[in-house]
Amino acid sequence: MESTPVSRRGMVAVVALFASLIVLGSASSALATEHHPKGDFAVFNQCPLSNPATNVCIFAQTESGEFIVGKKTVPIKNTITLQGGVHVIFNAEREIVGTEFIGAENGVTLSKTPQNVPGGLAGLVNCFEISNFFERIACEVIFENGLTGVTATTELAAPASSILLSGQNLIEAEGTALFLPVKVKLGNPLLGESCYIGSNSSPISLSLTTGTTSPPAPNEPITGKIGKVEFKDEAAVTVIRENSLVDNSFAAPAAEGCGGIFAFLIDPLVNAKLGAPSAAGHNTAILSGTVEQGNATYVKASE
């Protein structure tokens, strides 16, 4: 294995890193083609090789970091996986002029990985803030019965093709490396199945960079990290470790759909605790981990 500083060699579209955060995904397809690559290519078993446009296979994992919305910080402690492929677009001179992301073969482009929310339900819902006596009693009966754990799960708020990648950013740390429209599901039996920050029509739009951000106040600039690159199989596989993508310029909408039929009571309480909706300059995403990219031709040949 060869280790070297990041360069253009073997770096086609490797900027398809993480999501973070942000776990996300769409329904899997029962008709998806199964692939069984071998050796160093085994991690690319969900590369969309059935799509002839796929030039590069992507397997990326967010292993640490944090997601801050308004007043609430959620550390990333459970690994989030992003997988799929990239169609690399060349001009007549065979120069790379763009990329298009292609979702995973089984449809699960971004894993739905729950992260524990510090403080649990007590950190999101405070029934004492309800002034109406009967509504406050109803809140206490429903939300103060011991089911206190809350998780936050990041999901894609648009098709995988909405993911935008830029190899230029990973190489030179300028501009956006990875664009992701996401929504965050708050999980707890008492919050119901439809408690989300963001939606398909009003997503949290992350523009992640390995460079330095330029957020509005009160946030201050933060800087990502390109990471360390290794080559396997004569550069047919590129591995980037200790990579960090950051964004602290995005806005976050209010949470909606929390508490089922009691959403009219619970949504305002959750949003008060979160500080949502939260304007740009009050939120932060830091996604750190490892990305692997492989030449699709070699991946297919290894099966």
Language model segments and positions:
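Extracytosolic secretory-pathway proteins
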Residues: 33-303
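Secretory targeting and sorting signals
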Residues: 1-32
